[in-house]
Design a protein with these regions (language model features):
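Short loop/turn microsegments at loop-to-beta-strand junctions
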Residues: 35, 57, 136-137
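Short active-site neighborhood of thiol/selenol oxidoreductases, capturing the structured segment around
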Residues: 46-70, 76, 89
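Structural motif corresponding to alpha-helix initiation and N-cap regions
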Residues: 20, 46, 99, 120-124, ...
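Short, ordered coil/turn segments that flank beta-strands lining enzyme active or ligand-binding pockets
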Residues: 42-43, 52, 144
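N-terminal targeting signals for export/organelle localization
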Residues: 1-38, 172
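Structural microenvironment flanking redox-active thiols in thiol-disulfide oxidoreductases
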Residues: 70-109, 119-126
Length: 172
C-alpha cells in the first residue's frame, strides 16, 4: 500500500500523510532494483525509464495541489541544473486528475525536466514496499545500475539533493 499526502502542517492534515523530511540512504550492497516507469508525459510524448539505463535518475513525486511541492520546486530545478550531466531528473505527477493544473505548475516554476502524468498512482505503486515514495512530495535517487540508492520523504533541499546525486554518481 502506498500512502500519499501533502505537508505536515495542521492545515494539511485533512486525511493525507505528509513526509517528515526523513532521508534514507541505502548501501550499494543493499539496494533493490527500481521498477520500470512508463507513461504519458505532461504536454505530450511518452516516457520509459528503460531509456535511462546506465544513468543516475532522480524521481520527484509531486502534485500541483501540494504546498510543500510548490515550496521545493525551485530547489529541485536548481539541483537538476547543477547536476546536469551527472543525473537525469524526472517528475512523477500524481493525483492531478487532468494535465492543466500540472502544466500550470511546471510553467510557474520553470521546470525543465519531464514529468510523467500519473493521476491514479499506478506508476507509484510499482515501487512496492521496500522503499516506496509514501508521501507527497517524495524524492528517490536511482543509481546507474538501476537500483534505489536514496529516498527523501517530504521536501528536499537543493544542497541535500546535489549531495545525494554526487555521492550516488561516485558509486557511494
Amino acid at each position: 500500500m502506498v500512502l500519499t499526502g501533502c505537508g505536515a502542517a495542521p492545515a494539511a492534515q485533512g486525511g493525507f500523510v505528509g513526509g517528515d523530511g526523513s532521508l534514507t540512504i541505502v548501501a550499494p550492497d543493499q539496494r533493490t532494483t527500481a521498477p520500470q516507469i512508463t507513461g504519458e508525459l505532461l504536454g505530450g510524448g511518452t516516457f520509459d525509464s528503460a531509456t535511462l539505463s546506465g544513468q543516475v535518475v532522480v524521481y520527484n513525486v509531486w502534485g500541483s495541489w501540494c504546498a510543500p511541492c510548490r515550496k521545493e520546486a525551485p530547489a529541485l530545478e536548481a539541483a537538476a541544473r547543477r547536476t546536469a550531466g551527472r543525473a537525469t531528473f524526472v517528475g512523477l505527477n500524481t493525483r492531478d486528475l487532468d494535465q492543466a493544473p500540472a502544466q500550470a505548475f511546471v510553467r510557474a516554476f520553470d521546470i525543465t525536466y519531464p514529468s510523467v502524468f500519473d493521476p491514479d498512482g499506478r506508476e507509484l505503486l510499482k515501487f512496492g514496499t521496500d522503499l516506496p515514495p509514501s508521501a507527497i512530495p517524495s524524492t528517490l535517487v536511482v543509481d546507474a545500475q538501476g537500483r534505489i540508492a536514496a529516498r527523501v520523504l517530504g521536501e528536499v533541499t537543493e544542497a541535500t539533493l546535489v549531495g545525494l546525486v554526487d555521492d550516488v554518481a561516485a558509486g557511494k
